[in-house]
């Protein structure tokens, strides 16, 4: 099994994959979206097919009080669109997707802060830091889901 973690950002969508044993998440990159995360759907579908992803974990950016704001509603719309596009991709031979994976939204409060701390702890700063935050946030989101799945 392989899980995919997704952090929806305004400039980039960060991606992370699990190992087949579902113990560790690792970054696989970003997709530039230039303010429109819906532009990333086809590339995410390609990753799902190419990596034979069984489960997708999407960060749900709740407000600190636990309520859903504008960004959380956007993440929900994005996940619904991903699922619809995946169903269509399964029928379309030009995609390598053979089945629709489970899609899960998880609370991502403070994951960006955690990602920043992890990058600083790894002595990654300056220009290298900014583009890595989204994929590191995806790692935090996915690792949290992986750890929770073993409880």
Curated annotation (Swiss-Prot):
SMART domains hit by this protein: YqgFc (SM00732)
This protein's record includes keyword Repeat: no
Any Pfam family hit: RuvX
GO biological process terms held by the UniProt record: rRNA 5'-end processing
GO molecular function: nuclease activity
Keyword Iron carried by entry: no
EC number: 3.1.-.-
Cross-referenced SUPFAM superfamilies: Ribonuclease H-like
Domain of life from the UniProt record: Bacteria
InterPro entries: RNaseH-like_sf, YqgF, YqgF/RNaseH-like_dom, YqgF/RNaseH-like_dom_sf
GO CC entries: cytosol
Keyword entries, A-Z: Cytoplasm, Hydrolase, Nuclease, Ribosome biogenesis
Subcellular localization, as worded in the UniProt entry: Cytoplasm
Broad class of where this protein is predominantly found: cytoplasm
Function: Could be a nuclease involved in processing of the 5'-end of pre-16S rRNA.
NCBIfam families reported in the protein's UniProt record: RNAse_H_YqgF
Similarity comment text for this entry: Belongs to the YqgF nuclease family.
Protein name: Putative pre-16S rRNA nuclease
Organism: Bifidobacterium adolescentis (strain ATCC 15703 / DSM 20083 / NCTC 11814 / E194a)
């Amino acid at each position: 099994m392989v899980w995919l973690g997704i952090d929806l950002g305004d400039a980039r969508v960060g991606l992370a994959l699990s190992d087949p044993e579902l113990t560790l998440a690792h970054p696989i990159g970003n997709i530039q979206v230039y303010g429109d995360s819906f532009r990333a759907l086809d590339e995410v579908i390609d990753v799902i097919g190419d990596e034979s992803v069984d489960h997708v974990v999407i960060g749900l950016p709740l407000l600190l009080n636990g309520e859903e704001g504008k960004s959380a509603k956007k993440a929900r719309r994005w996940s619904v669109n991903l699922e619809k596009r995946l169903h269509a991709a399964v029928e379309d031979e030009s995609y390598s997707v053979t089945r629709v994976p489970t899609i899960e939204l998880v609370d991502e409060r403070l994951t960006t802060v955690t990602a920043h701390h992890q990058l600083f702890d790894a002595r990654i700063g300056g220009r290298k830091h900014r583009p890595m935050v989204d994929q590191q946030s995806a790692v935090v989101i996915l690792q949290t889901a992986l750890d929770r799945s073993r409880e």
